[in-house]
């Protein structure tokens, strides 16, 4: 029996998540992973590397709870929010019996984590405005244990209607966990569902330090939920999910000074986003620019595959969304520095496109 034959059947047929780094490229303008464009500096203060770290570092948990406006017992820290997705599926879904549900176009790790665990994936296509199709979701709920909703949604950038989220939570009460993925919530903090935890025992909120906190390389995420859910997740998480240096830097990032710095970065990103959107809307090859509540912009572009390759050859790396449902011709552009945004605009202006009267 070959090594391939020894592997689980669902792993043999699995298509791995195509992360921005896995797709590669040799550019000098990286606008494909929704990262903060400049490095932030921290000095390590914890020097106890000879000892195992805390399973759930107290200082990190307490600071994040204070920042998010929840109780420490409602916080779990993990190796990025991606681990939170995996833990929820492992804790709540029986392989071969239960299902998860999500609404494409959306983040790809929901399906990868479910398929890796042998859990069925059900999809309900988002509406034309990339909102929830609630009647269609209601028809698919039998056997669903976890529902993933990304808000703001990646890659489209819009918020999910809060009244629709309430309807979904009522629809799923006693049937399924509803997970609100808030990886980008710092760019629109008024829209968080963290304050709803007291109303909905089956609500879970995912957060990360990868985006607005500019710590994508740290791999530190958070799951916010009621204590009953957190206790179940603690049963399936690895004993030491965060290394001592990661916990040290995370705690610094969540200090009052760290949060102030994060908010200053967000303000700069939002200003740069306005510049990028305005420039894109004046560019002939750009057919449509969609409103965004995040640190990235989705645009529909004439001959998008050729444009993507042209910019790639110029060292400008974007994220091609052509294979996502309803996103034919779309590229996702991370908001970089002001100079990087201008390079994108200038490069796109050199591409053939439509007359201004034909664009939307």
Swiss-Prot record:
Which keywords are on file for this protein? Amino-acid biosynthesis, Aminotransferase, Histidine biosynthesis, Pyridoxal phosphate, Transferase
Give the domain of life.
Bacteria
Q: Which residues carry this modification: N6-(pyridoxal phosphate)lysine?
A: 211
The pathway noted for it is:
Amino-acid biosynthesis; L-histidine biosynthesis; L-histidine from 5-phospho-alpha-D-ribose 1-diphosphate: step 7/9
The top EC class, named as a word, is transferase
- What Enzyme Commission number(s) appear in the record? 2.6.1.9
State the Gene Ontology BP annotations. L-histidine biosynthetic process
- What reaction does this catalyse? L-histidinol phosphate + 2-oxoglutarate = 3-(imidazol-4-yl)-2-oxopropyl phosphate + L-glutamate
Residues annotated as signal peptide:
none
Show the GO MF annotations.
Answer: histidinol-phosphate transaminase activity; pyridoxal phosphate binding
What are its cofactors? Answer: pyridoxal 5'-phosphate
Subunit note: Homodimer.
The entry assigns this protein to a family as follows: Belongs to the class-II pyridoxal-phosphate-dependent aminotransferase family. Histidinol-phosphate aminotransferase subfamily.
Q: What is this protein called?
A: Histidinol-phosphate aminotransferase
Give the organism the record lists: Cronobacter sakazakii (strain ATCC BAA-894)
């Amino acid at each position: 029996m070959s090594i391939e034959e020894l592997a689980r059947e669902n792993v043999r047929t699995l298509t791995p998540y195509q992360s921005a780094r896995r797709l590669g490229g040799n550019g000098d303008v990286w606008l494909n992973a929704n990262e903060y464009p400049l490095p932030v500096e921290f000095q390590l203060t914890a020097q106890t590397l000879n000892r195992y770290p805390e399973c759930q570092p107290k200082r990190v948990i307490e600071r994040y709870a204070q920042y998010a406006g929840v109780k420490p017992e409602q916080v779990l820290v993990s190796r990025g929010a991606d681990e939170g997705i995996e833990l929820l599926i492992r804790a709540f879904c029986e392989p071969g019996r239960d299902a998860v549900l999500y609404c494409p176009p959306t983040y790809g790790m929901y399906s990868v984590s479910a398929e890796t665990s042998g859990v069925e994936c059900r999809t309900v296509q988002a509406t034309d405005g990339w909102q929830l199709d609630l009647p269609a979701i209601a028809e698919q709920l039998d056997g669903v244990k976890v529902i993933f909703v990304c808000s703001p949604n990646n890659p489209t950038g819009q918020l999910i209607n809060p009244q629709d989220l309430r309807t979904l939570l009522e629809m799923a009460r006693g049937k399924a966990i509803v997970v609100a993925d808030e990886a980008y919530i710092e760019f629109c903090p008024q829209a968080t569902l963290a304050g709803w935890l007291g109303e909905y025992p089956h609500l879970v909120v995912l957060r990360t330090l990868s985006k607005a906190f500019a710590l994508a390389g740290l791999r530190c995420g958070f799951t916010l939920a009621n204590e009953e859910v957190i206790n179940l997740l603690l049963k399936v998480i690895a004993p030491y999910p965060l290394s001592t240096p990661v916990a040290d830097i995370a705690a610094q990032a969540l200090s009052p000074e760290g949060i102030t710095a994060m908010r200053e970065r967000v303000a700069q990103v939002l200003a740069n986003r306005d510049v990028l959107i305005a420039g894109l809307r004046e560019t002939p090859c750009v057919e449509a620019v969609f409103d965004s509540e995040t640190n990235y912009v989705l645009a529909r572009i004439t001959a998008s595959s050729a444009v993507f390759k042209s910019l790639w050859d110029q060292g400008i790396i974007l994220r091609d969304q052509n294979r996502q449902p309803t996103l034919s011709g779309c590229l996702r552009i991370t908001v970089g520095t002001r100079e990087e945004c201008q390079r994108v605009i200038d490069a796109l202006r050199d591409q053939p496109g439509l007359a201004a009267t034909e664009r939307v």
